[in-house]
Every structure is written in structure tokens, then in C-alpha cells.
Amino acid sequence: MMTRRSFVRQGLVTSTSMLLAGMTGFSFSQFARATENRRWQMPDEGAPHAATWMAFGASAEIWEPHLLPVVQENLALVAKTIAAFEPVNMLVREEDSELAARLCEPSVNLLVHPIDDLWIRDTGPVFVKSASGALGGVGFNFNGWGNKQEHERDADVAEFVTDYVQAEFLRSVLTLEGGSIEVDGEGTAIITESCVLNSNRNPGVSKAECEEELKRLLGLEKIIWLPGIAGKDITDGHTDFYARFTHPGTVVAGLEQDPSSFDYAITRRHLDILRAATDAKGRRLEVVTLEGPSTIRQTYASDDFAAGYINFYLCNDAVIAPQFGDKRTDRNTHAILQELFADREIIQLNIDGIAAGGGGIHCATQQQPR
């Protein structure tokens, strides 16, 4: 039971953001010259954070009316929970600022800025650091997951956030989302082909060209490619719903138990790939599986409901994870996460409103490294 959000009510849209590498004003060779004097690396999510970024972005234009208030309450709950461990900055539309302030309370720093939706994992910058400690924010030209949703305002979020924290903005020649990238902080990434090597994002761009760009921007030495699955959900199969690094050398992978699900076969194929893989240091990966719930609370159940425990978020000293009302798998997930993250507090939240829209806690958060 790991379904994720499908195409939203508007259907296909015409993009106003950049799709092709040539449209960004850079070629791959030009970008190499532009960044050759500074080496960037994306820290792993478990490294110390300066802050977490979120977006109070649920709107009636995108979300069903009965879900909207629940999603807003869920976002506030996640933000307040994380704020007990580290600062939280939340983008909010001007017209929603009073509601957000009331729900989030003073522990969350609200910043008024135009946004379309809440998925800041995909719209926000992917933060990187240099060897000297300089902070950069990579903009991957968000295009509404391949022009499936209106995104004119969200296309600006990565640059706005980067400028706000006074970091260097790095515009990639690729179009992709943060949810498609999972790194261990030591040179290894797991990335889904179905998302990144997709003509709705990077037409005509080869895997080798993608690797060249991602290795340079994120400090990668090796990319483990998972096939993913395109066309089944709005993201075309993001990595953060399939596999996550817990530490260098250790990966937790989602395992779909429902044979009728489109994820049943692909999660098993992913397990085979991960178990056979080595990381950038030559280590064979240790792979731990997280079984999804067999049942969920029915109040907001739908075909889009994202019932996957793997979409947890690491903040300073804690793991913020979902729970779905299946006592057995909720309990087992807590135990597995506690074993994997022995030095962190495991907090499970009911985020059924967010899940009903096909996403999770990780999709709604973006870490800023310290």
C-alpha cells in the first residue's frame, strides 16, 4: 500500500520554467568552466542542520476542499514537531499568513512569499557546501513534475530561499526535483531513472550527461540508478519513496506487500539492485526493508494515499516519521528506525491529510545544512 499522488485536478499545463539544457543559457561544457574553481558536495540528511524549510502551500485550487484544512493542520504539526529540535522557516502566501501563524505558533518562522503548493523537497534548493564551508543552493528548474501542475510561483522558490540565506545560487542545466536524489554524504547517490531520465524533464539528455552534471554539482563519485516507474504518479517515481540512506553503507528500502500494486514488482527489483550494489567507497550496501501498512485509517483513504513509512525526515537529534493506524507495522517501523538511528528520538505523526495528497513528511521538508 504505497500509492503516491497522481495527476492533480488541473491536468497538464504549459510550463513557464526551463525544460531544455539549452534554455537555461548554459551548455554542459560551459557549466563545467563556470564551476571548475569550486568543489561542492551535498551533505547527507543526517548531518547537522542550520534549519528546516517548509511551505504552507496547500490551496483550494489544487487540493480537494475537504482535505485542505486537514493538510494545513498536518503541515503545522510537522513544523512544530521539528521546531523542537531546530529552526523551521515556512513559506506562506500573504492571504494565508494569519492562519499559518495561528496553527504554527511562534516556534515557526513564517516568510511571506508566493507559492503554488507545499512540496518544498521538490521546489526548494538542494543545498550543497564547499570544502571551505561556503553554502550553495542548487536550482533544478522545477517544472511541475514534467508539466503536470501549475508551478509559475514554485519555480522561483529555490532561488528565493538561496538568496534569503545569502548562499550562492547554482542553476543546473538539468530539470529534476529534490525528491529524486538521495545521498550518503560520502560520494554516493541513489537516483531514479524514471524521473531524471524522462523526456518531460530532460529531453535529449543522456545518462552520462546527467551523471556529469550531478557529480559536479553534488560532489558525487558514484550514482546507483534505480529504474523507478514513470507515469503512475505525478513524480514519475521519486527515490525518496523507494530507498533512503540511513548512514553511509546502509540503505532502508520500501517493500510493497500488495501484489496488485504497481509498486509490488518494482520494489523487489530495486531490492535486487541495491543488494548487489557497492557505494563510492567500495562497500557492499546493507539493505534494510520497511514494509508498508496493510491497513490505513479510512477517513482520507484514496487511490493517491501515500502509505509509505520510508518518507521520514531526519532533523537534529530526531527522526520524524508517519504512522498510519496499522498497529503492527506502525510498531515495527518505530522499532526498525530506532535500531537504525539509535542516537535519535523517533517521533511518529498522523499526517493522513498530506498522505492523501500522495506525499509525506520528507516531501514537505528541505534541510539546510549547518
Where are these regions (language model features)?
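N-terminal export signals
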Residues: 6-28
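Boundary at the C-terminal end of the N-terminal hydrophobic targeting segment
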Residues: 29-34
